[in-house]
A protein has these predicted regions:
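N-terminal strand-loop element at the rim of the active site
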Residues: 8-12, 24-64, 77
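Short hydrophobic "strand-cap" motifs at the C-terminus of beta-strands
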Residues: 6, 146, 189-193
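Membrane-proximal helix-turn-helix segments that form the acceptor-binding/catalytic region
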Residues: 102-103, 125-143, 156
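Conserved donor-binding/catalytic core segment of Leloir-type glycosyltransferases
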Residues: 180-197
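Helix-loop-beta element that forms the nucleotide-linked donor phosphate-binding surface
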Residues: 151-170, 177-180
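An aromatic- and histidine-rich active-site surface loop
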Residues: 12-15, 82-106, 110-112
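A conserved mid-protein helix/loop that constitutes part of the nucleotide-sugar donor-binding site
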Residues: 12-19, 194-201
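A short, histidine- and acid-enriched strand-loop-helix "catalytic/donor-clamping" loop
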Residues: 108-126, 139-142, 172
Length: 201
């Protein structure tokens, strides 16, 4: 079995679980495909995605052309292959690789964030989905959505695909921190204050 993961960049929130997939006996090949390793703004936030390229038993293709991905697809003709696409609506490269995959008898999945409702109500997301995405649903076997709140929303659109709640993950490293001796409450927020995060100050 081949497992291919298409992303806009190498993600520290996905590589830890992707690396673990290679230990299963029926998995022959795990490949991560992205047009770039990282973005400059994410490097400034502390991302060190280039270090993730060193994980064992995972191939990385930093693809600058559709031909590179086509060559990968061609190498798997007749093999049990699963393609998982992240950012399918947001990144042109991922969209083109998804469309190219439709020429092959692969099984497909989407890894997606749920609809973000702080800018647009759900009915507008539904309208966009019906107009833009519905035509592709028949080509997908799985949809992995972050959290469980919108599992039923995606199940509504099709009985064909299996919808599963999903989470991002990071590599676990054991840490020992001294317990502060103080009566003051201290709160540490780790994250960005971008509108997309919907942090209410």
């Amino acid at each position: 079995m081949n497992l291919f993961f298409f992303q806009n960049c190498i993600s520290p929130h996905q590589i830890p679980f992707i690396e673990e997939l290679s230990v299963f006996t029926d998995v022959d090949r795990v490949v991560v495909i992205a047009p770039r390793v990282d973005y400059d703004d994410r490097k400034l936030m502390g991302w060190k995605a280039s270090n993730l390229l060193k994980v064992s038993n995972v191939e990385f293709i930093i693809a600058s052309s559709v031909d590179q991905v086509k060559k990968l697809y061609e190498s798997c003709k007749g093999e049990d292959t699963y393609c998982f696409f992240s950012g399918i609506n947001a990144f042109a490269e991922v969209v083109s690789w998804m469309k190219l995959s439709l020429n092959y008898p692969f099984k497909r999945g989407v890894i997606t964030e749920p609809p973000l409702l702080y800018h647009y109500p759900l009915w507008q997301h539904s309208l966009r989905f019906a107009l833009k995405d519905w035509k592709y649903v028949k080509h997908f076997n799985y949809l992995l959505v972050m959290g469980d709140e919108f599992v039923n929303y995606y199940r509504f659109w099709s009985k064909r695909w299996k919808v599963l709640p999903f989470i991002y993950c990071t590599e676990w490293k054991e840490r020992t921190l001294p317990v502060p001796i103080t009566e003051k409450l201290k709160v540490l927020y780790v994250g960005s204050f971008s509108d997309r995060k919907n942090v209410v100050a």
